[in-house]
Amino acid sequence: MGPWSRSLSALLLLLQVSSWLCQEPEPCHPGFDAESYTFTVPRRHLERGRVLGRVNFEDCTGRQRTAYFSLDTRFKVGTDGVITVKRPLRFHNPQIHFLVYAWDSTYRKFSTKVTLNTVGHHHRPPPHQASVSGIQAELLTFPNSSPGLRRQKRDWVIPPISCPENEKGPFPKNLVQIKSNKDKEGKVFYSITGQGADTPPVGVFIIERETGWLKVTEPLDRERIATYTLFSHAVSSNGNAVEDPMEILITVTDQNDNKPEFTQEVFKGSVMEGALPGTSVMEVTATDADDDVNTYNAAIAYTILSQDPELPDKNMFTINRNTGVISVVTTGLDRESFPTYTLVVQAADLQGEGLSTTATAVITVTDTNDNPPIFNPTTYKGQVPENEANVVITTLKVTDADAPNTPAWEAVYTILNDDGGQFVVTTNPVNNDGILKTAKGLDFEAKQQYILHVAVTNVVPFEVSLTTSTATVTVDVLDVNEAPIFVPPEKRVEVSEDFGVGQEITSYTAQEPDTFMEQKITYRIWRDTANWLEINPDTGAISTRAELDREDFEHVKNSTYTALIIATDNGSPVATGTGTLLLILSDVNDNAPIPEPRTIFFCERNPKPQVINIIDADLPPNTSPFTAELTHGASANWTIQYNDPTQESIILKPKMALEVGDYKINLKLMDNQNKDQVTTLEVSVCDCEGAAGVCRKAQPVEAGLQIPAILGILGGILALLILILLLLLFLRRRAVVKEPLLPPEDDTRDNVYYYDEEGGGEEDQDFDLSQLHRGLDARPEVTRNDVAPTLMSVPRYLPRPANPDEIGNFIDENLKAADTDPTAPPYDSLLVFDYEGSGSEAASLSSLNSSESDKDQDYDYLNEWGNRFKKLADMYGGGEDD
């Protein structure tokens, strides 16, 4: 047999209850798999969303979804063929018939009839549905073709195999035997693939390799996997496929092994107190994992098992058996009596006859405004100082039986007899108290006591007819010392700016509002920026203390000068009132016109005329038109002309070519009232050409040293100081060789030097006053040249007195100054005398022989020295005394 003949002998699936013959599949034809469908419903009342059954349409394109349509608007057919109820439905007849339509890929229309039977009316399974009570058969063959279902050639087409869940075994258990007609030609081996075979969960289904028996190895769970799709394979002994793979669909049928589960353990809802019967409160929901399409294992019914409290009636609420909506069934809900209800709700499958579970529903009765706020107490008293706003007078207390912090509890206060709006009541959000305050200042002199009537309500209106509570509040106004009041608060006075100094301008007084007090008012000026005014402290009369000036633009704005006046009473405490005085200063012609600018530049070549503005600080008519005139010979070189009809500016230009330099021009300006003034213009002629804008005067050289010169001088001084410092350091480092003060022992010189004359008698009583008078000048001229003298302050020596009687005091004071003078002789330091003096009559002492000499000393020459050395000659010469 050739390859084409072998492929035409397709696999035959033999499902053997008896010997069915294999037949070759026919071409696929679109259509419903049954001409009619019959579904059974449990009762005559169906809720919205109830699943009735499923129809199936084959369009031969392999699509999983199909568009269905029904003329009966009570039902909905999904794209998967599931028929559901669109709205609540009640059966008036035991049967309902309607048609379901579908279209194939060529838009041909097909229809099937659907019949709904209530329980008890010919109740039997629909003929097109496979049994779910167990395994259909051990052996099956290809079913005969029908107008509603056509098989494509070369395909294995078998109905789904149903297998109940939760079977007890023993396992493995046979499901169906698969046979190929090729087993007559040779040995055929069978295998399966797909979910449950070689993909997770692996090993749920197995097939005997040689016999083709498909078996299940363990209990199935529909809630885990509802459908298994397997593919069977047939191969020869050499491993070659003898048939194409065949799809096997295994459907797990449901058992009621799952009880309903509420979506929440505790459901919470609320209802207004006093709600009418039929008012929906809340909805509870439960789910069931069992099949809710083909069985009633997931058909849940709701009931209320208990209610706590059972007051005022044990059945205050009811629940919709199918939807779980809880509603009010009787009147009497009162939040103040029973604020909450707790219901135990049950959900049971099999329409309430199967497995069940419970949950709790907590219903809160919300408040309505059925209790009015009541004042407690109903009378109040308070005091408030006059003239003070936003002052708390008293606190109003109310009680309300409604729920706190709700609109039915929040109080709203209203003053019934406050036409002037002088009081206000606000609500404390914490305790609902009313705070009575003044909205504006009260006047003790106008009214000393107020009696107010206050009513209280709630934010929301009363739900029932209730009486509004009211309270009476007595408010006493306390008198306080009030500040004097200026009348008017702002006073305008017109005065000429040339008003005489010391004259009274006006009188600005204040009134005392405290009519029950006798007080004295004192006036003074609080602000007078120009220091022009003074006031009589008793009468309030205001006069000038200096000349007024309207053109003082620092203090006068828009011809108005502002001063602040205060009035102080002598009450306790002292009160002060303020008034504003506005002096409107009228203008006088006290300012002559002036030119602007006063410094002007011209170019030497081709100069352009310059415009000069004329400015007058006065007001019209004391201003323009102005008159301009060149004076003091300025018209010889310059000319002016008016620039505008109002003569508020002039044009200045030279008459001839001028040399570069500075010029002074005298310009006389006069206003409309003949007030004139001569002003000197500074004119500079620059070395340039054209308009004045391009003319720039050379910058003068600044007098004195410039910064670079100053820096150079400072640098030179610094360099000189550094040089001197280096020289001093060099001199200090040089080794100073000094002669010893005493000769060494081996260098004895027997020379005698004459150091002045020692004779002459006692001279300590003969002093020269000029030496004392000279002070520091009396120091010897012999100074050290090896030690720099220390700079110290010079002591103060008294001058020689004219009176001889004071000479003693003069000597004592100057002696004290000399004793503390470190620069006065004698100096406490060794002095090196480079010059010993000349013209001494005595020979040098170095000629004397030392007493340590070995030879005899000859001292006879001492006799030749005169009387001053006679004593010495007698001592050493051996001569006798006279």
From Swiss-Prot:
Bias type Acidic residues, positions: 755-767
Glycan-modified residues: 280, 285, 358, 470, 472, 509, 558, 570, 576, 578, 580, 622, 637
Modification sites for Phosphotyrosine: 753-755
A cellular component term, taken from the record's GO annotations: perinuclear region of cytoplasm
Site label Cleavage, positions: 364-365, 700-701, 731-732, 750-751
Modified residues (Phosphoserine): 770, 793, 838, 840, 846
Effect of residue 598 to Q: In a gastric cancer sample
Region span, Required for binding alpha, beta and gamma catenins: 811-882
Membrane topology: Single-pass type I membrane protein
Record annotation: effect of changing residue 156 to D: Protein is partially unfolded, no longer binds L.monocytogenes InlA
Induction notes from the record: Induced in the hours following cyclic mechanical strain in keratinocytes. Expression is repressed by MACROD1.
Outcome, altering residue 340 to A: Found in gastric and colorectal cancer samples; cells exhibited decreased aggregation increased invasiveness and non-uniform migration in vitro compared to cells transfected with wild-type sequence
Annotated Ca(2+) 1 binding sites: 257
Resulting phenotype, residue 473 to D: In a diffuse gastric cancer sample
Extracellular side: 155-709
Record's disease association: Diffuse gastric and lobular breast cancer syndrome: A cancer predisposition syndrome with increased susceptibility to diffuse gastric cancer. Diffuse gastric cancer is a malignant disease characterized by poorly differentiated infiltrating lesions resulting in thickening of the stomach. Malignant tumors start in the stomach, can spread to the esophagus or the small intestine, and can extend through the stomach wall to nearby lymph nodes and organs. It also can metastasize to other parts of the body.
Additional remarks: May play a role in blister formation in Pemphigus vulgaris patients, expression is lost at sites of cell-cell contact between the basal and suprabasal layers in blisters and immediately adjacent to blisters.
Stated name of the protein: Cadherin-1
